[in-house]
Amino acid sequence: MQIQFHLYNTLSRTKEVFNPQDQANVKMYVCGPTVYYNPHIGNSRSGVVYDLLYRIVIKIFGEKAVKYVRNITDVDDKIIDRAALLGVTIDELTDKVTKEFHKNMAYLGCMLPSIEPKATKHIDVMIAIIERLIAKDHAYIADNHVYFDVLSAPNYTELSNRNLEEMFEGVHVENSKTKKNPQDFVLWKPAKQNESANMNFESPWGLGRPGWHIECSAMSYKYLGENFDIHGGGADLIFPHHTNEIAQSRCAFPSSTYAKYWVHNGFLTVNGEKMSKSLGNFITVRDLMDKQIQGEVVRLFLLSSHYRRPLDYNDKAIEDAKKTLDYWYRAIENINVQKIDLPHDFMQSLLDDMNTPLAVKIINDYAKGVFISKTEEERQLNASAIITCANFIGLMNKTPHEWFNSGVDELYINELVNKRLEAKKQKNWLLADQIRNQLLEEKIILEDQPDGTTIWRKE
């Protein structure tokens, strides 16, 4: 029987059965980072959501049938400004932040995309598309800029489902006097005086650089063609970025529908507030890594809420994710687990618009099953279901021993445990208690065994 994957499409505002244009060549594009600042936890939500989507599509159609493109935006005004602020070159900044992004994705257990193109390597494709738009009267030159004529695009507001006036209400419009319409957006902008040479490129309109929106249209076209299946990104990209992508791509290639399914993940707040540097609640993934919060904990937190709903980062949410993973790892401890077929109810939860809260509940139910099982066979079956389901969503990639002792200096702890055992032999109870309390402060729990040995675990 054909698997049916129901996915919410922002374009139609309904859940649809995912039906790719070619089941042997499923195409997926996701907007990646602008590499001017270390990625924050909001960026990480997008990374994890589309990693899960990629895993599901691979499960249905096979790894060889799926092409996942996630771009790197390495040309942008923000990059120029931050490089100047830090006193480094553009290349130094973008290389450093790109490497950090890759470390963050690995920390969160994300698979590599099939292709990760950089905007600066595709300027020729951008120029070619802009030339097509000018030739078709969808773009024009004004004051050394090239602008897209928004009013020339059919169904410009289709994705956002708002009228034009509402969409631009309160939006700062640059160079409005030189444009045909205030809403027109830039496709190409001229170089400014004293700007870094490696952030500007030769073009038919002089030295300059592309606008943000044309970059994704060019890279998706280069690797996926005029039409592809899935386009993903954060809900904040619906307007203007994705709206403008659709407009320029469909106008450049009139027979194109561009992306068939538009998928958007919800916003992430911190303690109920929007994340911002001014509020002092701007949290990067590196901050979490430096706190030695395990990547699986952050990943489970990000999957604990439905991807389209808002998600709030707070200490309790992270603590709850850690407790849940502790529970799962404890459930499979000392059991010979086997990889089994994905349980039907678990897979159905993910096929229903990636219902991860239900998927997590199902894993919890299997963990409960381990502890109430009456036979070893039943325990093994439940434990095997836990590891199979968790692995599929990118979790539980360690042994229980590795998990509970992660970040622990085992040699140091074993030395103290042996020192305490020696103190007990000599009936130096004061020293033995001091060592126990010292380890307890470091969240190491000692368990004295009937045979006189001591085992330890991380709290």
From Swiss-Prot:
- Which Cys pairs does UniProt list as disulfide-bonded? none
InterPro entries per the record?
A: Cys-tRNA-ligase, Cys-tRNA-synt_Ia_DALR, Cys-tRNA/MSH_ligase, Rossmann-like_a/b/a_fold, tRNA-synt_1_cat_dom, tRNAsynth_Ia_anticodon-bd
Q: Name one GO molecular function term.
A: cysteine-tRNA ligase activity
The record's GO CC annotations read: cytosol
- List positions binding ATP: K277
Sequence motif 'HIGH' region, residues: 33-43
* One Pfam family of this chain: tRNA-synt_1e
Name a biological process GO annotation: cysteinyl-tRNA aminoacylation
Q: How is the cofactor bound?
A: Binds 1 zinc ion per subunit.
Keyword Cytoplasm listed:
yes
Q: What is its EC number?
A: 6.1.1.16
Give the record's keywords alphabetically: Aminoacyl-tRNA synthetase, ATP-binding, Cytoplasm, Ligase, Metal-binding, Nucleotide-binding, Protein biosynthesis, Zinc
What cofactors are annotated for this protein?
Zn(2+)
Keyword Iron-sulfur tagged: no
Binding of Zn(2+): at which residues? C31, C216, H241, E245
Family, per entry: Belongs to the class-I aminoacyl-tRNA synthetase family.
Q: How does it assemble?
A: Monomer.
Q: HAMAP family attached here?
A: Cys_tRNA_synth (MF_00041)
What name does the UniProt record give this protein? Cysteine--tRNA ligase
